Amino acid sequence: MEVLGLLKFEVSGTIVTVTLLVALLALLKWYSMSAFSRLEKLGIRHPKPSPFVGNLMFFRQGFWESQLELRERYGPLCGYYLGRRMHVVISEPDMIKQVLVENFSNFSNRMASGLEPKMVADSVLLLRDRRWEEVRGALMSSFSPEKLDEMTPLISQACELLVAHLKRYAASRDAFNIQRCYCCYTIDVVASVAFGTQVDSQNSPEDPFVQHCRRASTFCIPRPLLVLILSFPSIMVPLARILPNKNRDELNGFFNTLIRNVIALRDQQAAEERRRDFLQMVLDAQHSMNSVGVEGFDMVPESLSSSECTKEPPQRCHPTSTSKPFTVDEIVGQAFLFLIAGHEVITNTLSFITYLLATHPDCQERLLKEVDLFMGKHPAPEYHSLQEGLPYLDMVISETLRMYPPAFRFTREAAQDCEVLGQRIPAGTVLEIAVGALHHDPEHWPNPETFDPERFTAEARLQRRPFTYLPFGAGPRSCLGVRLGLLVVKLTILQVLHKFRFEASPETQVPLQLESKSALGPKNGVYIKIVSR
């Protein structure tokens, strides 16, 4: 009897264990797919998701190719799941206009994963709601034409170092990866303009600032951890934020200490002794802390060329005092954002321009004539002179940004339930603006894979459908630093082409292979020859 009782107990225990295991597996299976019915309920086409990770494998080749494939297979309104999070992708101009401009109050915030480094979370890129409005409004004065004119000599100094380095390659006549040179150059620009220090990253790669900049640009989440985060976000995101991360903590500590030391030094200096760099402009904005409301923001007009994006905006309202000055963390955040944009976006844009000019010698020849004429009149270019005398350079930059938009996708979050051109959008939905797909849509851009600066003549711009060209976004949350970024690009190409011409070589990759992790860039560099003029 005792043996029978023991057997019954063991059998009962086994049944309970098996039942619990089956229930757990059933629950896990339900969880793995439970988030993946929302797009279908909204009537939005999308790729079939996989358990837990959604459409993560769809993007294994990078977001650029996958975005173009999404548009081709599912149309200008489609969607996907990244982990359990639903993304609605739009590349239809009228829908984009409603989201970015007409219904901006409901789409004023960008998506945040919760895993961004603190320096990024404290930047104007990811600040939210009222605090974003206050900080952006105060920062607008830092990008006025007068302030940019003060920063132009700092960019020119870094450009002189770049030209000196390029002379060595011109003398050798060997093909080389010019993207590496631009990478070093943009670190020099960022150090000087954003962090108030001077470096020569080409000759001093061991400099702590240079090393930390490169570490920041290669910072990423390991793939196994990313899969876990996407599969179980409510558990893994808070856990990942509190777990120790040596690389993240060292980067935060280095840039925080650097900025705090510079601020302390500036506080001891007289006003006329302080460097007129971006950091000083932010500090000046902090002390005055005047802001404008969102209705008066300096908005990048959609569909315009690079030249029009650099013109002084009209003043639409008077500034008012904000209630809360910048914190030191927010100051660090703005400088770090400049680092991200400079090291990636400017480097890649310069690389793409160089590649296109090297492989289109007729366009380069026309641009060289314009450069020589301009430099004959303006041997020491200033911000204002750069805005009027280089129309073909503006066209070349604009067409490059159409073909290779560095920020080829950006997001907005829906604050409340709404409709966009009849499409229901629930609160919390992430809307993704597919700039890459928009810029390569043959309906708006005939022969989109062809480099043709003539698309950006004054006449062509007037005939273009609005909201089909968005390299800097549009509306109140468009790119705040567009004028500074374009200043760096224009001044660099101007100074380099004044001394050299670009030539394609057998090592030049045609067509150029691309990679698209956070921004769009050349996958294997840009190999060319450079010839002294």
Swiss-Prot record:
Its EC number is 5.3.99.5, 4.2.1.152. Pfam families: p450. GO terms for molecular function: 12-hydroxyheptadecatrienoic acid synthase activity; heme binding; hydroperoxy icosatetraenoate dehydratase activity; iron ion binding; monooxygenase activity; oxidoreductase activity, acting on paired donors, with incorporation or reduction of molecular oxygen; thromboxane-A synthase activity. The chain crosses the membrane at residues 11-31, 76-96, 224-244, 336-356. It catalyses: prostaglandin H2 = thromboxane A2; prostaglandin H2 = (12S)-hydroxy-(5Z,8E,10E)-heptadecatrienoate + malonaldehyde; a hydroperoxyeicosatetraenoate = an oxoeicosatetraenoate + H2O; (15S)-hydroperoxy-(5Z,8Z,11Z,13E)-eicosatetraenoate = 15-oxo-(5Z,8Z,11Z,13E)-eicosatetraenoate + H2O. Disruption phenotype: Deficient mice are viable, fertile and exhibited no gross abnormalities in size, body weight, and anatomical features of major organs. However deficency causes a mild hemostatic defect and protects mice against arachidonate-induced shock and death. It is a multi-pass membrane protein. PANTHER family: CYTOCHROME P450 (PTHR24302:SF47), CYTOCHROME P450 FAMILY 3 (PTHR24302). Monomer. This is Thromboxane-A synthase. It comes from Mus musculus (Mouse). The lineage of its organism: Eukaryota, Metazoa, Chordata, Craniata, Vertebrata. The gene is Tbxas1.
